[in-house]
Amino acid sequence: MLCLPVFIILLLLASPAAPKSLETRIQNDLIRAGLTDADLKTEKGFLSGLLNVADSVCCKVDTSCCSN
């Protein structure tokens, strides 16, 4: 009778350690890839926005730096 609680505890400890299914791993990879793509797109948009602001400030101060 003492073996039953030990067996149950071992089952509880072993179940979270079970490997993830392939489908779950693929979903995690796709989510991570999507976040990476989103970061890159945001960064490019952010950098181009900064360049536009810097260009407009430069044009207001000195017209020789304007690209137009």
Curated annotation (Swiss-Prot):
Propeptide: 20-54
Subcellular location: Secreted
Domain of life: Eukaryota
Keywords of the record: Disulfide bond, Secreted, Signal, Toxin
Signal peptide from the UniProt entry: 1-19
Post-translational events: Contains 2 disulfide bonds that can be either 'C1-C3, C2-C4' or 'C1-C4, C2-C3', since these disulfide connectivities have been observed for conotoxins with cysteine framework V (for examples, see AC P0DQQ7 and AC P81755).
InterPro entries: T-conotoxin (IPR031565)
GO CC annotation, single: extracellular region
Molecular function (Gene Ontology), one example: toxin activity
Tissue spec: Expressed by the venom duct.
Predominant subcellular localization, coarse grouping: secreted
Free-text comment about domains: The cysteine framework is V (CC-CC).
Family to which this protein belongs: Belongs to the conotoxin T superfamily.
The protein's name in its UniProt record: Conotoxin Lt5.11
